[in-house]
Amino acid sequence: MHPEKYSVRGVKGGKEKMGYEYRRNEAIIRSKTREFFGVGTVVTATSYLVPVVDFMLIGILLGADAVAAAGLGDSFVDIAELPGFVLSAGGPVAVGILLGRRKRRLADGAFTLSFLLALIGGLLAWCLLPFCGYFSGILSNNGAITDDVARYAFFTLLSTPFVGVNLVLSGFAIVDNRSKLAMGSVIAANGVNIILDVVFMKFLRMGVAGAAAASLLGNAAGILVALPYLFSKKRTFRFVLRREDIREAWRELASSSSSFATDKISRIISGLIVNLLLMYFVGNMGVALYAVYGQLRSILRILAGGALQTISTLGGMLYGERDFYGLQRMFSLLAKYTYAIVAVIVAGLFVFSAAFLNSYGMTPDADTVMAFRIMLFSLPFLWLNDLLARFYTSVQRQRLSVLLLTLQNVVFKILFLLLCVAAISQLHWSSIPAVACWCLSVELLTPVATLLWEKRTYHNIAILGLEDQTERTCHTFSITGERENVADIHREIEQFCRQNGIPHNKGVFLAIALEEAVLNIIGHNDHVDMIDICLLLEEGDLIVRIRDNGAPFDPLAFVDDGDILQENNISLLERLTDQKAYTRIMNMNNTVLSIKLEGAQNE
């Protein structure tokens, strides 16, 4: 694939300022987006496949009342997933941005904090175990399903440490080039859970509590599979947390995790209020229908959730490197992939609505089928909310992500539900279709309000294009992994230096040095088909990032004793470089060089 031409844009306003064109290819971004989308889809199933399968088996084996009991227990599921979900999502975002900014030690600190906090948070959740009966009585209005809710909540809370550690290990394993291990952990957890679901509920007759107990043991099995990564000496991220780094590592982790914490906490709070209102004013059928709607979101996350994982990991790294072109192409590709999936889900379930409702033990009468189909039309907007919330976090617009999630999970959800309850009680609306219209209105108005606020606050829409808000100048281009194309580097650097006022003699030395580095990569790695190069002016230094999708190879450490003519050395680059670093992250070779321009001039 030949590189495409794009106009070079300046650092403000998105207007052309340099007056020339450069070539940037999306080949690496496209291949890595597809790779991590596939891996992320499997790993995301750790959180969402288990509840979906549980609910389906509960409906088939135990009936609609058991589904309602499990639905009321969803608030406890959110508590169980809170530490692991927040840290397995926010942690990779933080380390990706830190690695992009060349802060390796802080990335280790964020990894260490993520693991410790997931474990500690899970153990603290056990403090709620004695109160399961009390909360279940409130949620179920002391009805016939009170005991089922209590038992389900007990085993769910008991699983919290296992869920947290399993999610964190899987999330960081993906970033650390261990995708197969992460997928193996997920397959083990889900496989054990599904088998034990049938054993506990059908043969041991544990009721709805059997589903929660099976999930606990499934996550424990997933941790056993991931233990080799935990004890591996080849991990990129180390258990290192220096005293002087604690505050900054915590700040980076908290910033990246704030929206995920808001998501989970707001779901817990609103879930309690919503389930109470539905139980008191709509009845068991309303709770069951809302639980099925929650499973629609889970099904969507299972099939398309790899996009969210990719935005967190690959997107965070690209933003840290200020590769806005790559970030935009990644999001565009993910949107195309996932909305095709959304369309298939909506069309398929619209046709087979009755069969789907039957699988959850619900009677598919006319009102219920109509309500379910109305809910299906909320899925495109629901997915947009998910994409926006994750993208805002990766580009450090956490306040927008928090705003969106607060509107979606608390403000609009509770406000519109109160209006819905009023319409049912005062205007005598049919309760089931009214619940469906409530779900649709919440998902539709949330992105509208958020995007309007973003436009007013930032004067642009992030998903449509980011602008560099710093004073630093950045230029990226791509070349294919062939020796004859290395000459393109000279032209790109010469134009870059001319447009930024860098003297010609400096540009010549820099061009020759980078040609040496790229030839070294191509000469010792037969699997390189594309190389991305980024030039960044930062505080008087030139930062050069060289990214390739070949096999693991460190061009800074390799010594070829048989290279008598020194065709593949980097001697000039060694003299010019002030600092240099190599990282193998997300299955890409990343070489970062810091060159003092004064040093280049003296050479």
Labelled PLM ranges:
Residues 40-93, 159-163, 254-317, 342-345, ...:
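Transmembrane helix-bundle signature of multi-pass secondary active exporters and lipid flippases
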Residues 6, 10-40, 95-159, 208-255, ...:
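Short alpha-helical transmembrane segments in multi-pass integral membrane proteins
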Residues 67-125, 166-175, 289-347, 386-396, ...:
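Small-residue-rich hydrophobic transmembrane alpha-helices
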Residues 543-570:
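Glycine-rich/acidic phosphate-handling loop/turn and adjacent ATP-lid/helix
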Residues 129, 181-206, 220-229, 345, ...:
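Alpha-helical transmembrane segments of multi-pass membrane transporters
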Residues 172-198, 209, 213-216, 307, ...:
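Alpha-helical transmembrane segments of multi-pass membrane transporters/permeases
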Residues 456-511:
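Bergerat-fold GHKL ATPase/HATPase_c domain
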Residues 504-529:
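Conserved ATP-binding N-box helix of the HATPase_c
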